[in-house]
A protein has these predicted regions:
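Solvent-exposed loop/turn segments connecting transmembrane beta-strands
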Residues: 47-52, 137-139, 165-175, 190-201, ...
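Transmembrane beta-barrel domains of bacterial outer-membrane proteins
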Residues: 37-138, 142-146, 233-241, 296-304
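Outer-membrane beta-barrel "beta-signal"
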Residues: 177-185, 246, 290-305
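Bacterial Sec-dependent N-terminal signal peptides
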Residues: 1-40, 305
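Repeated loop/turn-to-beta-strand initiation elements of outer-membrane beta-barrel proteins
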Residues: 38, 67-72, 113-117, 155-160, ...
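Transmembrane beta-strands of outer-membrane beta-barrel pores
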Residues: 40-48, 81-89, 123-129, 163-169, ...
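Outer-membrane beta-barrel translocator/channel fold
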Residues: 81-101, 195-282, 286-297
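Surface-exposed extracellular loop regions of Gram-negative outer-membrane beta-barrel proteins
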Residues: 147-150, 160-164, 171-176
Length: 305
């Protein structure tokens, strides 16, 4: 499979590194690729007119491979960013817009004979309005960091676990994160998640160079930082999406992934940004959001160099 790319939001190979099988060091819910990538995705849900757009960019700025390494490990510096804009029909007492922005600097390198480690630092912005003017330092801007250790079981499987550091509550907090990835021949499977942003997983098969198909499960979480009754709060929205994701390759660099499925459950809750209550209860007296299953459709474009 030289110079091929197999997607379910997963694998990439670049021309100069045909012997490097892959790099699945997951930071938050984004993979790190060995080649530059730009992707755009639009999500449409059947109820409440929910519409979401997402733009992601990742650019490796320095990349080295290890000669004769049995686990195809690499050393890489990369910069990345992600933008999510979400909007639905207005509901009294609940945010109907959400803007999540992030930017990170990442470094991955081998450790010992069969390990790698990943570090990252960056910023995250979580606002209840899709306007850049709604960004306010001290209100909805937080610092992010990560440290993950990755065990390369063999050439087909790797497992990673570590911590995310986030100033969600106004001071550094540590949250767990983990992933597992497997690839053998045309088959691939992966799962990843963390406390703050939920999780995703997929099982897929590449039928031919221009076509692959995955079964995708997505329980991602989106956040909006705001004031509720004069107190600092965060509004979380979580989906439970299951669907089929066909991916069509057009030419050398372009991929068109689709997802057709159902949002089995969508809920939204307020949490006060205070340690004593954040993990145990919702914001007292605040409304909650809950919807029955709805159709889900997503279309995207990926450009990989």
């Amino acid at each position: 499979m030289k110079n091929t790319i197999f997607y379910c939001n997963t694998l990439s190979k670049s021309k100069g590194f045909d012997k490097v099988h892959k790099l699945f060091a997951w930071l938050y819910l984004l993979p790190i690729f060995v080649s530059a990538q730009v992707s755009f995705k639009t999500d449409i849900l059947g109820k409440e007119g929910l519409f979401r757009e997402e733009l992601s960019l990742q650019l490796p700025i320095h990349l080295d491979s290890l000669a004769k390494d049995p686990y195809k490990r690499i050393s890489v510096w990369a910069v990345g960013g992600n933008m999510v804009f979400q909007q639905m029909n207005p509901t009294e007492g609940l945010p109907y817009q959400t803007m999540n922005l992030s930017a990170n600097i990442l470094h991955l390198r081998p450790l010992g004979t069969r390990w790698s480690w990943l570090t990252a630092v960056g910023l995250g912005i979580y606002t209840p309005e899709n306007r850049l003017s709604s960004i306010a330092i001290g209100e909805n801007v937080v610092a992010n960091g990560a440290l993950l250790f990755i065990w390369h079981s063999n050439q087909h499987m790797q497992i990673g676990a570590g911590i995310l550091v986030n100033t969600l509550l106004g001071y550094p907090m540590v949250f767990p994160t983990a992933f597992v990835e497997y690839q053998a021949g045309q088959w691939i499977g992966w799962a990843k998640g963390n406390f703050l942003e939920g999780g995703k997983g997929a099982i897929g098969y590449r039928f031919s160079e221009p076509f692959s198909l995955c079964l995708l499960a997505d329980a991602s979480i989106y956040a909006a930082f705001l004031r509720k009754e004069g107190k600092k709060a965060v509004f979380f929205t979580q989906h439970t999406i299951v669907g089929l994701q066909p991916d069509f390759r057009v030419g050398k660099y372009l991929h068109i992934p689709l997802v057709i499925g159902a949002d089995l459950m969508r809920m939204g809750i307020y949490k006060e940004r205070k340690l004593s209550t954040f993990f145990t209860q919702t914001f007292e007296g605040a409304p909650k959001q809950s919807y029955s299953p709805a159709l889900y459709f997503s279309v995207g474009i990926k450009i990989v160099n």
